[in-house]
């Protein structure tokens, strides 16, 4: 999300919301993207209108000023989604109004989370999270296992290709059931748990504490007893 010049006649600040132009930090205004689920486009449009109506400033990474940085939407096979708003601060103006708009735009949303990110860089995810409404995690099914996913936990964005990728990795590994397998940067444990039936022991390592919490719970929920996770 970026502010552009005051050039539309009424002193209004037009908000650009979309994706980066290749090899730049310039945001290209995007109303629809065929690569994302419809609920992501709907959430982005609701935030766009909220910013216009309440003059909420988009973040400018050149100056470190402005509030809204990113709209982060994670969806599952049931069409449900978890929405996270990444902000340069602790609060948004008129938070309750924004929550209602997002719930109307995305009726299958399970939760809306605010993430604080005051870093002066282009890292997307935040340092702290606060649930504005609903759940703080989303459930999804991958490789026949159910995973609970918090906002900071890494998860493959293309579920169908991830399943093919994991199957090919297992094939190439040629495990006999006697190995100890180390999964570095394991996120919520998706690859670790996919490998578990084929190895004696699987170990996942990750620097994000929330992801390790998710991975441990996912192992327990799926009845995987030979997996351990470390942060």
Listing of model-derived features with the role each one plays in the protein:
Residues 1-14:
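Single conserved hydrophobic/aromatic residue that forms the stacking wall/gate
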Residues 12, 46, 50, 70, ...:
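Peripheral terminal and linker regions in Fe-S/redox and tRNA-modifying enzymes
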Residues 12-58, 78, 92:
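Extended interfacial segments that mediate partner engagement and assembly in macromolecular machines
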Residues 18-21, 86, 215:
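Short, acidic/hydrophobic/Gly-rich beta-strand patch recurrent on exposed beta strands
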Residues 29, 73, 79-88, 146-150:
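Short, aliphatic-rich beta-strand segments
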Residues 64-78:
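Short edge beta-strands and adjacent turn/loop segments
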Residues 94-231:
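Rossmann-like S-adenosyl-L-methionine
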């Amino acid at each position: 999300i970026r502010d552009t010049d005051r050039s539309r006649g009424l002193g209004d600040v037009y908000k650009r919301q979309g994706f980066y132009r290749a090899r730049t930090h310039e945001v290209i205004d995007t109303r629809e993207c065929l690569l994302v689920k419809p609920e992501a486009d709907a959430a982005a449009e609701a935030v766009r209108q909220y910013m216009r109506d309440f003059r909420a400033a988009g973040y400018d990474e050149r100056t470190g000023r402005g509030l809204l940085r990113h709209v982060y939407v994670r969806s599952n096979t049931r069409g449900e989604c978890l929405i996270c708003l990444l902000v340069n601060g602790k609060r948004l103006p008129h938070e309750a109004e924004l929550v209602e708009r997002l719930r109307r735009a995305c009726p299958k949303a399970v939760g809306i989370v605010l993430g604080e990110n005051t870093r002066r860089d282009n890292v997307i995810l935040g340092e702290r999270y606060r649930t504005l409404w609903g759940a703080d995690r989303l459930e999804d099914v991958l490789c026949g296992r159910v995973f609970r996913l918090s906002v900071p936990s890494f998860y493959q964005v293309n579920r169908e290709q991830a399943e093919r990728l994991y199957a090919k990795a297992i094939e190439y590994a040629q495990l006999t059931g006697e190995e100890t397998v180390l999964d570095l940067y394991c996120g919520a444990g998706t690859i670790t748990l996919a490998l578990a039936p084929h190895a004696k022991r699987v170990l996942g390592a990750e620097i994000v504490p929330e992801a390790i919490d998710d991975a441990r719970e996912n192992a327990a929920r799926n009845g995987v007893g030979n997996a351990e996770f470390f942060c």
